[in-house]
A protein has these predicted regions:
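Short beta->alpha connector loops
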Residues: 52, 74-76, 133
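Generic protein-terminus/edge-of-domain signal
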Residues: 1-62, 83, 106-110
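Acidic-residue sensor for enzyme active/binding pockets
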Residues: 43, 79, 129
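Short peripheral tails and domain-boundary helices/loops at the edges of structured domains
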Residues: 95-105
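Amphipathic alpha-helical segments enriched in hydrophobic/aromatic residues interleaved with Lys/Arg
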Residues: 103-152
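Short acidic-glycine-tyrosine-enriched beta hairpin
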Residues: 58-73
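Ligand-binding loop in jelly-roll beta-barrel domains
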Residues: 74-97
Length: 154
């Protein structure tokens, strides 16, 4: 018989005070004005389809499917879709946290094409719970958000 055993301590390397502020799933259509805006929370922006640009503090960045953009609070940004390949994306607003990046910017764009199955799974799970609103969905959403943040901190 082969067995693997794992034990866990009560000490956690970090605690999260993250609170799900809002969440949206969008498909770009011609009526979106792409107006630069800010939020009082951190925004996780995951591109599920299409391509376009992300404007962050007057800098343009190309984005496409399986890119994750993390924007800390109070940073001006907006998305701009390409008509030939319209953007579909998830946004998750998270209160109580902000990220520190190696280059000391207040945002980061990650190419997640190699790890997309893991991150996209958490975004899909979160939105499935929010859509269906089955008993206990709020708790599942909180835990899914905690797992997503732990994955991002790696």
């Amino acid at each position: 018989m082969s067995t693997q055993f794992f034990s866990f301590s009560d000490d956690t390397p970090f605690s999260t005070e993250a609170v799900l502020a809002n969440a949206s799933s969008s498909h770009y259509e011609e009526d979106w004005p792409s107006i630069p805006h800010t939020h009082a929370f951190t925004e996780l922006f995951y591109v599920s389809e299409g391509s376009g640009e992300f404007l962050i503090e007057n800098q343009h960045f190309s984005i496409k499917k399986d890119d994750l953009i993390i924007v800390n609070p109070h940073i001006q940004h907006t998305e701009i879709s390409l008509s030939a390949s319209p953007l579909s994306y998830y946004t998750v607003g998270v209160d109580g946290i902000s990220f520190s990046f190696h280059d000391q910017k207040e945002f980061q764009i990650f190419n997640c094409r190699k790890i997309n199955t893991d991150l996209l799974f958490y975004f899909h799970s979160l939105f499935q719970e929010l859509d269906e609103k089955k008993e206990g969905y709020e708790e599942i959403c909180r835990h899914t958000l905690s797992i997503l943040i732990a994955q991002l901190r790696r």
